């Protein structure tokens, strides 16, 4: 690991949380790794912000890009463990830490994920000590091998706009899973390092998810999300259950760049 250069990348809305900053100040650097340089991109469109940060990582010749969202609370050894997993396998392009959705319902990682039908995805099985092969991890805490990005054509981070018509609700999502799919298509691997347990801070409730960490008996089997009476929960994977029907329509987004 000696001589590895790592860029810390933060895509922020402009108001980083206090728990994020406190944890960042306690982050341990792996042996032989120079002090972290930082690239912070402020805005309200995460894919473009990640694009700016990746441009910095490529232009400045970093070995790894360490994405951390400004509402994620890292354990002190997060970077040490993620780098250990990445260095053990040069074919691993992305290693993600474990964190949950703010409602504590699900870990942010997917198996059997496909960009043309996201309803095929489920939550992969993992244990507290595993570095499991998965299809995608959240980039709230993720270490990316920069050399694998060089095999892709920019822009590096496409995105989905998820439209819930009955609820009249729209959200941007999946730039992390789509990047993972792109590098997997190039023959690389994506791993979830469940040793890295990150809290996901909610500004509104001033609390962190998960409310309670699941044990191996719960996480050691593949699971799927079901919606019942307005709430969601995880249940063991059952491929016979009908999936939500999706329709996909492409809409152009043009990046206009100025100096």
What are these regions (language model features)?
Residues 1-40:
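N-proximal low-complexity "stem/linker" segments adjacent to membrane-targeting elements
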Residues 57, 86, 183:
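Hydrophobic pocket-lining residues that define ligand/cofactor binding sites across diverse proteins
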Residues 155-247, 251-258:
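C-terminal catalytic/acceptor-binding lobe
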Residues 62-73:
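Short beta-strand-to-loop acidic/aromatic patch adjacent to the donor-nucleotide binding site
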Residues 44-49:
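A short, glycine-/small-residue-rich helix N-cap motif at loop->alpha-helix starts
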Residues 52-64:
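Active-site nucleotide-sugar/metal-binding loop of Leloir-type enzymes
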Residues 75-163:
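Conserved catalytic core of nucleotide-sugar-dependent glycosyltransferases
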Residues 62, 90-92, 188:
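Short, high-confidence coil segments that cap the C-terminus of an alpha-helix
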């Amino acid at each position: 690991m000696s001589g590895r250069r790592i860029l810390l990348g933060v895509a922020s809305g402009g108001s980083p949380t206090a728990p994020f900053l406190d944890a960042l100040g306690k982050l341990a650097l792996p042996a032989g790794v120079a002090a972290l340089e930082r690239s912070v991109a402020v805005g309200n469109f995460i894919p473009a912000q990640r694009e700016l940060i990746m441009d910095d990582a490529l232009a400045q010749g970093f070995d790894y890009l360490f994405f951390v969202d400004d509402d994620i609370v890292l354990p002190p050894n997060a970077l040490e463990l993620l780098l250990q997993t990445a260095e053990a396998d040069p074919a691993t392009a992305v290693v993600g830490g474990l964190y949950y959705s703010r409602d504590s319902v699900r870990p942010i990682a997917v198996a059997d994920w496909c960009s043309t039908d996201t309803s095929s995805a489920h939550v992969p099985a993992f244990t507290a000590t595993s570095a499991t092969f998965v299809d995608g991890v959240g980039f709230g805490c993720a270490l990316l091998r920069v050399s694998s990005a060089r095999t892709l054509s920019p822009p590096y981070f496409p995105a989905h706009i998820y439209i819930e018509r009955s609820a009249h609700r729209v959200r941007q999502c999946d730039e992390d899973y789509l990047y993972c799919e792109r590098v997997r298509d190039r023959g690389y691997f994506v791993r979830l390092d469940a040793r890295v347990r990150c809290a996901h801070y909610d500004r509104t409730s001033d609390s962190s998810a998960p409310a309670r960490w699941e044990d191996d008996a719960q996480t050691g089997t593949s699971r799927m999300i079901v919606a019942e009476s307005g709430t969601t929960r995880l249940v063991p994977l059952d491929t016979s259950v009908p999936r939500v029907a999706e329709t996909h329509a492409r809409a152009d987004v043009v990046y206009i760049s100025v100096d």
